[in-house]
């Protein structure tokens, strides 16, 4: 029942117990109270008996006291949605945090929604071109699909997601939503200013902006970090249903959603499961991921960065995420140590749509040939390490030389990394990517030095770089 009144009976960090006189609020209902003159939202997590509910706070609880009055809103957390959110930054409960006044939305939605029915879902497979060679060739993304960027600490997940925002969101005519889940506030701030510079956000005319931002960063309590992905998803769902177009939904980082869920679970006293994660890990992930889908009215293409703890892909958090994805881009520390960026592992990354029926026979064959050469090189590395290159057959020496060129040719300068590399970013059309790698595999460029293939765009740049290298050597 809405407007039922209760009183705070216990505060333990982010967990607040509230006692009601008669009607208990339902699980997931939002409760409002006041703390230090500001509104504090609590979400009901458990019914304890004796008319008491256990709740998780969506903001800091310092200063909250026993006996404080709490009001039941009668429903889940609701946030403003629609065009009024474009160009704005909101927190988990839909409050603006960009100091630009209130969000004047005509519509609001609850952040907990059921996934679309099977009959409403649509299945289509069309490639989403990113302009990044290694992705477009070996693990292409599908429109309306779910894409995961997996990697340990510091291998370039955020740089890659920023480049994808740069390449796709800027040329994408529809709307984008970015959810910053438990990541660095500095990165969130940088992204906002980058979007203003690139005209994706227009501060002078916010209604013409193409992106809405939702942040629940590292410094937030676990309740906020566990729900902010759902807040972003609710915005994306509304854009999909309203505009009927392809909406881009970026999440950085989905692991923090799981991590916050595990913190909340421990605070609620649940017995942990494997590696200390919450017993409801698969359910929490499934409920969220099933909402990110394409319906007959429109589609959501989601790109999610997934932190891999201690570089262990079998950790329950990344392993549970794998099951929901259409394409996985795995970033490897071994490749980043070679100085090859983006540090995408060409053999570990995969895509459901790398299929001749979808991408075409030529693309499929070139991708498989490239992977075949790289796989052969990988299997020869032990022999090279022990006996040296001289012990290899002539055919194997040629394979190794081509593999090293391919490995370097899969690198590419990024626009967003210009400050590190000093060179302008390059986007490569998919036709050029396929024809270039087809020629390299066929041996047409065996005469060029492998250094010419490093950090360039198309094959024309390789030839030009090789000529410059030859001129410098002369």
Swiss-Prot record:
ATP binds at residues 151-158. One of its GO terms (molecular function) is ATP hydrolysis activity. The lineage of its organism: Bacteria, Pseudomonadati, Pseudomonadota, Alphaproteobacteria, Rhodobacterales. Its main location: membrane. It is a peripheral membrane protein. Disulfide bonds: none annotated. Its EC number is 7.1.2.2. The keyword Cytoplasm does not apply. Belongs to the ATPase alpha/beta chains family. The keyword Membrane applies. It is found in: Cell inner membrane. The gene is atpD2. Keywords: ATP synthesis, ATP-binding, Cell inner membrane, Cell membrane, CF(1), Hydrogen ion transport, Ion transport, Membrane, Nucleotide-binding, Translocase, Transport. It comes from Dinoroseobacter shibae (strain DSM 16493 / NCIMB 14021 / DFL 12). This is ATP synthase subunit beta 2. It catalyses: ATP + H2O + 4 H(+)(in) = ADP + phosphate + 5 H(+)(out). Produces ATP from ADP in the presence of a proton gradient across the membrane. The catalytic sites are hosted primarily by the beta subunits. It is an enzyme of class 7 (translocase).
């Amino acid at each position: 029942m809405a407007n039922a009144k209760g009183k705070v009976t216990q505060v333990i960090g982010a967990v607040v117990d509230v006692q009601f006189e008669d009607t208990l609020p339902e699980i997931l209902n939002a409760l409002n109270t006041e703390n230090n003159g500001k509104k504090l939202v609590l979400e009901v997590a458990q019914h304890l008996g004796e008319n008491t509910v256990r709740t998780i706070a969506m903001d800091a609880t310092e200063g909250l006291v026993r006996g404080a009055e709490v009001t039941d809103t009668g429903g889940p957390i609701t946030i403003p949605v629609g065009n009024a959110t474009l160009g704005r930054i909101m927190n988990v409960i839909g409050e603006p945090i960009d100091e630009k006044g209130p969000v004047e939305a005509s519509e609001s939605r609850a952040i907990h929604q059921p996934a679309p029915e099977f009959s409403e879902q649509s299945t289509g497979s069309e490639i989403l071109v990113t302009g990044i060679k290694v992705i477009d060739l070996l693990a292409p993304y599908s429109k309306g699909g779910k894409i995961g960027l997996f990697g340990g600490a510091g291998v370039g997940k955020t740089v890659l997601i920023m480049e994808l925002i740069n390449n796709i969101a800027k040329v994408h005519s529809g709307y984008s939503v970015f959810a910053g889940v438990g990541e660095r506030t500095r990165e969130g701030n940088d992204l906002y200013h980058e979007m203003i510079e690139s005209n994706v956000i227009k501060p002078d005319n916010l209604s013409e902006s193409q992106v809405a931002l939702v942040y629940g960063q590292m410094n937030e309590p676990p309740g906020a970090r566990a729900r902010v992905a759902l807040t972003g998803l609710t915005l994306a769902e509304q854009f999909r249903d309203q505009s009927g177009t392809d909406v881009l939904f970026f999440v950085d980082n989905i692991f923090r959603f799981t991590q916050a869920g595990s913190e909340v679970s421990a605070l609620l006293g649940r017995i942990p499961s494997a590696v200390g994660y919450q017993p409801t890990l698969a359910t929490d992930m499934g409920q969220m991921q099933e909402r990110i889908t394409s319906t007959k009215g429109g589609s959501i293409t989601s790109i999610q960065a997934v932190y891999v703890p201690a570089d262990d892909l079998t950790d329950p958090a990344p392993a549970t995420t794998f099951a929901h994805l259409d394409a996985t881009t795995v970033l490897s520390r071994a490749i980043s140590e070679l100085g090859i960026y983006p540090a995408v592992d060409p053999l570990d990354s995969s895509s459901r749509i790398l299929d001749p029926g979808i991408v075409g026979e030529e693309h499929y064959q070139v991708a498989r040939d490239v992977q075949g050469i790289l796989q052969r090189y990988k299997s020869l590395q032990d022999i090279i390490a022990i006996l040296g290159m001289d012990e290899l057959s002539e055919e194997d020496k040629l394979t190794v030389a081509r593999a090293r060129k391919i490995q370097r040719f899969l690198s590419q300068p990024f626009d967003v990394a210009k400050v590190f590399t000093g060179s302008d970013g390059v986007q490569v059309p998919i036709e050029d990517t396929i024809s270039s790698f087809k020629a390299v595999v066929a041996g047409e460029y065996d005469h060029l030095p492998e250094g010419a293939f490093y950090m360039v765009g198309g094959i024309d740049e390789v030839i030009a770089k090789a000529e410059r290298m030859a001129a410098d050597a002369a």
